[in-house]
Amino acid sequence: MERYESLFAQLKERKEGAFVPFVTLGDPGIEQSLKIIDTLIEAGADALELGIPFSDPLADGPTIQNATLRAFAAGVTPAQCFEMLALIRQKHPTIPIGLLMYANLVFNKGIDEFYAECEKVGVDSVLVADVPVEESAPFRQAALRHNVAPIFICPPNADDDLLRQIASYGRGYTYLLSRAGVTGAENRAALPLNHLVAKLKEYNAAPPLQGFGISAPDQVKAAIDAGAAGAISGSAIVKIIEQHINEPEKMLAALKAFVQPMKAATRS
């Protein structure tokens, strides 16, 4: 959990925002997935947002659903995902690692057991996409017991009550939604979020990272100009994996070429 705090402090000192890529663990297979993650970090990722393949991904658009299917086809299990997380943490001791997932995966293991496992492998945060703030108590309590930051989604239409709850319960960072709907790079993010950012700041929320529809450097810059601490990009990255599925080396080169200008856009 402290890794987020030190990251944001360092970025602030360097006058930079955070660029955070999302990928599904095990897509398109364990070995290549680990290479992908190394490449993202080498290209300038400040933190990682990682998905665990799940059979019913509600908030995911087709691009990320396909990533899940590829990981399933490779036979990737949640247990293997945790082994991967331990390897990533060993190799990259300081980068914040977040999980973005669904409640069923937490229930399958048992809530406390799940967060204990996260702590053991070095996961810093968990966002459970299908658990609203008002039902989050057992999750966030277990998370905090195990020094894992509970992450909450702040939708564009959040009212004052919700903003206060997110500020009060969230740690690590706040996932600022560019718009409602499913994820996807086709639907470009285009909402001025200044008012939400100002409110979150007023209520001392964890730093907001803008996600959903972030696929170009100008959007990263716009998010930071609106006061966000950085931006999360998922579908655009997963699409690159899909496009080069049979050319592993080309895939890594294309990912590097995508991430470098996205990170560059965080520097004011």
Swiss-Prot record:
Its EC number is 4.2.1.20. It catalyses: (1S,2R)-1-C-(indol-3-yl)glycerol 3-phosphate + L-serine = D-glyceraldehyde 3-phosphate + L-tryptophan + H2O. The active site is at residues 49, 60. GO terms for molecular function: tryptophan synthase activity. Transmembrane segments: none annotated. One of its GO terms (cellular component) is cytosol. Keywords: Amino-acid biosynthesis, Aromatic amino acid biosynthesis, Lyase, Tryptophan biosynthesis. Pathway: Amino-acid biosynthesis; L-tryptophan biosynthesis; L-tryptophan from chorismate: step 5/5. Belongs to the TrpA family. Tetramer of two alpha and two beta chains. The alpha subunit is responsible for the aldol cleavage of indoleglycerol phosphate to indole and glyceraldehyde 3-phosphate. This is Tryptophan synthase alpha chain. The lineage of its organism: Bacteria, Pseudomonadati, Pseudomonadota, Gammaproteobacteria, Enterobacterales.
